[in-house]
Amino acid sequence: MAELDIQISVDDIGWPGEETLLSFCERVLGAAVIYLRDSEKQPFPTMPPEVSLVFTDDASIQDINAEWRGKDKATNVLSFPAFPVRPGKMPGPMLGDIIIARETVERETIELEKSFDDHLTHLLVHGFLHLLGYDHMNSDEAEIMEGLETRILAQLGLSDPYEGQDLKMEP
């Protein structure tokens, strides 16, 4: 049984095809659901909840970031929960939207010396946790969220993306 009902939109020709991205996202987000559910960190509905993923470019995500967050710049990932939810509480049937910008991800992979797939995996997990109410606005929240990211990524065979870094809090 699928862990999530994943809907994908590809708005930039630089991304792989929809089938490739869907398979990738099912593996990554499926692992996140299994870890969160089995570790009793997060309950999930019996029916697979829906998440919408948009794979776009820097110009599009910059427009969205300016409109919804008042930040007129491109960013790697934006998450828009469909409904307010607190971490560890049952989400609704529609989790929300995750939007990822290809050019920013590509630049960051060079800066971080990571593979594109590994960095994209991290951003998908990060965005997914935001849909479940997790955040990093203060050090306590950041510690919880980054700890979950690290453990989920470990389930996928990836190393700690925060190793040797300070907690990443929003300004």
Swiss-Prot record:
- Pfam families with a match to the protein in the record: YbeY (PF02130)
Needed cofactors, names only, are: Zn(2+)
Q: Where does Zn(2+) bind?
A: 126, 130, 136
The record's keywords, sorted A to Z, are: Cytoplasm, Endonuclease, Hydrolase, Metal-binding, Nuclease, Ribosome biogenesis, rRNA processing, Zinc
Q: Which InterPro entries has this protein been placed in?
A: MetalPrtase_cat_dom_sf_prd, YbeY, YbeY_CS
Top-rank taxon = Bacteria
Q: What is its EC number?
A: 3.1.-.-
Report the locations given in the UniProt record.
Cytoplasm
GO molecular function terms attached to this record: metalloendopeptidase activity; RNA endonuclease activity; zinc ion binding
- Explain the purpose of this protein: Single strand-specific metallo-endoribonuclease involved in late-stage 70S ribosome quality control and in maturation of the 3' terminus of the 16S rRNA.
Recorded family membership: Belongs to the endoribonuclease YbeY family.
What protein does this entry describe? Endoribonuclease YbeY
Organism encoding this protein: Rhizobium leguminosarum bv. trifolii (strain WSM2304)
